[in-house]
Amino acid sequence: VKKLINIIRYEKENDEFTKFLSSICDVRIIWGGSKTIKAIRKFPLQERSSELTFADRYSLCLLDSKKIEKLNEFDLKLLVKRFYNDTYLFDQNACSSPHLILWMGNSSSFSRQRFWKTLSLYLEEKYNLPEKASYDKYNKLCNDVVNLKNFKSQEKFGNLIYTLLLNKLDEDVDKMRGKWGYFYEYKINNLNQIKKIINNKFQTLTYFGVEKKLLQTFVKNNLRGIDRVVPIGQALDISLNWDGIDINNALTRVIDIK
């Protein structure tokens, strides 16, 4: 691989060099969020050049509460470990890390308590919350409690898990983003209840206890968003299919000979 690629590092403020690279590339890939995309797009490409962009995205997690209620202690600990990998490894900053947790089923209250308490015990051994992050996290909680109109209740499981239970999902729910173990929650009976909120900013849906066939039917129901549906624990697994784009094909020139 080393012989096939060149890596160039320069200051991001160097617009002239960004302009030069844009003018000679066949394909420009911008991976850095919506703000970065807007900044770089001011530099034109060649007429036949193409572009792949990876903008800011929003992800969510779906849990079947009845299945969690029936889990034995070993399997529950394994589940929270996988959830930890999806969320806390990058402090919820990854585009595929969930911010919104959906609880499906009638036994959600008991399952919620069981899940979060088990995760809290795991975090005490694994996760170190910086002092500044702790302050910012609490400040965000205070702001949400005061300003959110769809706020129902809040709960803290130590200082490492903050949850805010919502009484409804607004169409701009993708603006509700947490860090360092800050999650928004909502209870549902079926997936049709969240169809109206899914826009093209939604990327990854992680799940546990829900039949794959049910999820396939849901995401194929003319949704504008959700490009990935993976089990809990696989949110950060990168592949050549990302953000709904087949990257390998997008970077390949096809010569048609008949």
PLM features: residue spans?
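Rossmann-like NAD(P) dinucleotide-binding subdomain of oxidoreductase/dehydrogenase enzymes
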Residues: 1-88
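Structural motif
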Residues: 29-31, 60-64, 100-102, 184, ...
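Residues that line or immediately flank small-molecule/substrate-binding pockets and catalytic motifs
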Residues: 32, 209, 233
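Glycine-rich beta-alpha junction loops
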Residues: 35, 55-60, 67, 100-107, ...
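NAD(P)-dependent aldehyde/semialdehyde dehydrogenase
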Residues: 81, 90-203, 213-257
